[in-house]
């Protein structure tokens, strides 16, 4: 292997650790601490719990995401929306299509709700480690919340500057973090090697059989070790499948060694309350404060990765017309994935601080955490099974069914959390889900209410108006499709006689591929009437002005339609409010404001 190849090989692994594995990598801070608070720390119980953790990582993260999900992609991109795009080509319109679409909406909503709980529990659990510093054990919970809230505030405030430069440090910090986890775990295992027996799955099965219903509900806390596993698939488009997979093997080994080490520490120190921090303080008191600082940095990186992930999901949702248009800023010239959505950023900050104030302790937050994750995993499992059953990879169907069944078991165990704060997962997910459902239904309703003309009918009147006289220059008119003429265009050209020497109908079509841009100019649709189509991937960022210039279109004025919705229906009223609060099509695509003319059409719904 050449030197350059070695650099890219290790460089990809290091970057993946920083951008993809922050969430799952910080799970050891709180997972075992929460489980032990609910379970008696006998040797048999500890062996069973550690075995459950190890096999949860193997089945739900490695098998479901690293092996199965990552084999399904579109131009290297992954995630719930990509799974839907793959499935849409395989099924006919009807009930199945509606079912798949709803599953996608639900999966996206759950992931967005998860984006609130993850930063809150990660930062709060790291800050709680300060209580083990000599002299700081008396810090009040209010002080800890204030510190955690301040860290969250700084994290969100700096989002608009972009994380491009800072992201370079994320990888090395997370490499250091995983090395520290592996080292501390190995030291602890060496003092009690009997814990290695937990690798055998029979201890996990034995624990579930001997503990009955309480043992089954322990699964709702065990799932905390796998939170962030979905990032392997959702974020693989940023760095590629191979670097993410390679990094996962290192991360998996580090996590397993650390969980085994924590298990060994509990067996020898059954009274320990905060397991990871207690283990580190016992092993190396002098290095405890540096480790605590590293922990806080790791949780900030984990939160950052999740915030970027939410931005990415929202952007995909906008471009697939699942979500309303929002103001998007691009913070990096190198990385297409580096975007900033201000409205989402500030909403996340408010909700993260609210969650910290409501739950106060990371142990309480753990009661709400996990439901959204298992819900997302079940949805991924169902969609993967549907895809594999329709391809040549039918041998993967039993594996996909197996992981989906395991996902369902974890989801059922998490229902126990609903009365104890788990309902927050549903509340947080219900808001984006309601917006998605109202927006998609509203768009369909609006299209039917507008009653657009077909091109042939429009041309009969247009040709007559064009002969009478026209304005010098080029006029641009935004439409969804050339052959479907919206009412505002009829009002402009036919009723108001606003016809230019050259009239160009411009449409932007988002393809079901993640990236790629092509423009098509079709001259002579009518006399002095051309069509200009921009085809762009649903994650693609492009410059409209540049594309117009490249195709020789020197516009004098740009027209677009604005719908004024009149309705007594409460759902359509909400839809109308969303439309008014969010940017319109031309604002979203950053069309030059000086040349814009909005034409209002009153629509009754």
Curated annotation (Swiss-Prot):
Localization per record: Cell inner membrane
InterPro entries per record: K+_transporter (IPR003855), K_trans_C (IPR053952), K_trans_N (IPR053951), Kup (IPR023051)
Keywords assigned: Cell inner membrane, Cell membrane, Ion transport, Membrane, Potassium, Potassium transport, Symport, Transmembrane, Transmembrane helix, Transport
Coiled coil, from the record: none
Ion transport is among the record's keywords: yes
Chief subcellular location: membrane
Disulphide bonds in the chain: none
Cell inner membrane keyword on record: yes
Membrane topology: Multi-pass membrane protein
Catalytic activity: K(+)(in) + H(+)(in) = K(+)(out) + H(+)(out)
Record's GO cellular component terms: plasma membrane
Residues spanning the membrane: 18-38, 46-66, 97-117, 138-158, 169-189, 204-224, 247-267, 287-307, 339-359, 368-388, 395-415, 418-438
Top-level taxon in the UniProt lineage: Bacteria
GO molecular function, one term: potassium ion transmembrane transporter activity
PANTHER family the record matches: K+ POTASSIUM TRANSPORTER (PTHR30540:SF83), OSMOTIC STRESS POTASSIUM TRANSPORTER (PTHR30540)
Family (UniProt): Belongs to the HAK/KUP transporter (TC 2.A.72) family.
UniProt function note: Transport of potassium into the cell. Likely operates as a K(+):H(+) symporter.
Name of this protein: Probable potassium transport system protein Kup
Name of the gene encoding the protein in the UniProt record: kup
């Amino acid at each position: 292997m050449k030197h350059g190849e070695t650099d890219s090989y290790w460089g990809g692994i290091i970057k993946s650790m920083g951008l993809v594995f922050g969430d799952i990598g910080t799970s050891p801070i709180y997972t075992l601490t929460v489980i032990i608070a609910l379970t008696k720390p006998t040797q048999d119980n500890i062996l069973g719990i550690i075995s459950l953790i190890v096999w949860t990582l193997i089945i739900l993260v490695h098998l479901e995401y690293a092996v199965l999900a990552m084999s399904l992609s579109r131009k290297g991109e992954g995630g719930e929306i990509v799974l839907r795009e793959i499935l849409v080509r395989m099924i006919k319109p009807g009930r199945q299509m509606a079912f798949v679409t709803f599953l996608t909406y639900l999966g996206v909503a759950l992931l967005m709700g998860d984006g609130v709980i993850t930063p809150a529990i990660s930062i709060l659990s790291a800050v709680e480690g300060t209580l083990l510093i000599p002299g700081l054990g008396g810090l009040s919970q209010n002080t800890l919340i204030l510190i955690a809230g301040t860290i969250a505030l700084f994290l969100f405030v700096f989002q608009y500057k972009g994380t491009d430069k800072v992201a370079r440090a994320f990888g090395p910090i997370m490499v250091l973090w995983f090395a520290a986890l592996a080292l501390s775990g190995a030291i602890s295992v060496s003092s009690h090697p009997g814990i290695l027996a937990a690798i055998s799955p029979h201890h996990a099965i034995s624990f579930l059989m001997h503990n009955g219903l309480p043992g089954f509900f322990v699964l709702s806390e065990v799932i905390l070790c796998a939170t962030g596993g979905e990032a392997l698939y959702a974020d693989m488009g940023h760095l590629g499948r191979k670097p993410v997979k390679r990094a996962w093997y290192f991360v998996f080994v580090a996590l397993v060694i650390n969980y085994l080490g924590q298990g060994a520490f509990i067996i020898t120190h059954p009274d320990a309350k905060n397991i990871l921090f207690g283990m580190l303080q016992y092993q190396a008191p002098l290095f405890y404060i540096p480790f605590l600082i590293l922990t806080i940095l790791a949780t900030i990186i984990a939160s950052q990765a999740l915030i970027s992930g939410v931005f990415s999901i929202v952007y995909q949702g906008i471009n697939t017309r699942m979500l309303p248009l929002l103001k998007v800023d691009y913070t990096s010239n190198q990385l297409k994935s580096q975007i900033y959505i201000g409205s989402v950023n500030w909403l996340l900050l408010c909700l993260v601080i609210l969650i910290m104030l409501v739950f106060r302790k990371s142990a309480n937050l753990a009661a709400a955490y996990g439901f959204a994750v298992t819900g997302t995993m079940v949805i991924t499992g169902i969609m993967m099974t549907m895809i594999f059953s329709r391809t040549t990879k039918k041998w993967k169907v039993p594996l996909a069914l197996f992981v989906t069944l395991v996902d369902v078991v974890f989801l059922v165990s998490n229902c126990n959390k609903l009365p104890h704060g788990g309902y927050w997962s549903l509340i947080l997910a219900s808001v984006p889900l309601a917006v998605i459902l109202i927006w998609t239904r509203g768009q369909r309703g609006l299209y039917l209410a507008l009653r657009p003309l077909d091109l042939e009918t429009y041309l009969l009147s247009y040709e007559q108006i064009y002969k009478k006289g026209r304005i010098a220059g080029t006029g641009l008119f935004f439409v969804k499709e050339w052959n479907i003429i919206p009412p505002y265009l009829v009002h402009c050209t036919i009723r108001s006689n606003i016809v230019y020497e050259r009239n160009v109908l411009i449409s932007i079509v988002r393809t079901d591929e993640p990236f790629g841009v092509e423009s098509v100019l079709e001259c002579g649709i009518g006399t002095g009437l051309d069509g200009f189509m921009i085809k762009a991937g649903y994650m693609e960022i492009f410059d409209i002005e540049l594309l117009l210039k490249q195709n020789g279109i020197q516009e004098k004025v740009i027209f677009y339609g604005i719908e004024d919705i009149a309705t007594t229906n409460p759902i359509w009223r909400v839809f109308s409010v969303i439309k008014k609060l969010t940017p319109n099509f031309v604002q979203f695509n950053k069309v030059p404001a000086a040349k814009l003319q909005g034409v209002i059409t009153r629509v009754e719904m």
